[in-house]
From Swiss-Prot:
It comes from Pinus strobus (Eastern white pine). On the 2D-gel the determined pI of this protein is: 7.4, its MW is: 83.1 kDa. This is Putative cytochrome c oxidase subunit II PS17.
Length: 16
């Protein structure tokens, strides 16, 4: 399921 991977990508691109 690429859904979890997509979530990780968005999470990584999100500036903390």
């Amino acid at each position: 399921s690429p859904t979890v991977i997509a979530l990780r990508v968005v999470e990584a691109l999100s500036p903390r």
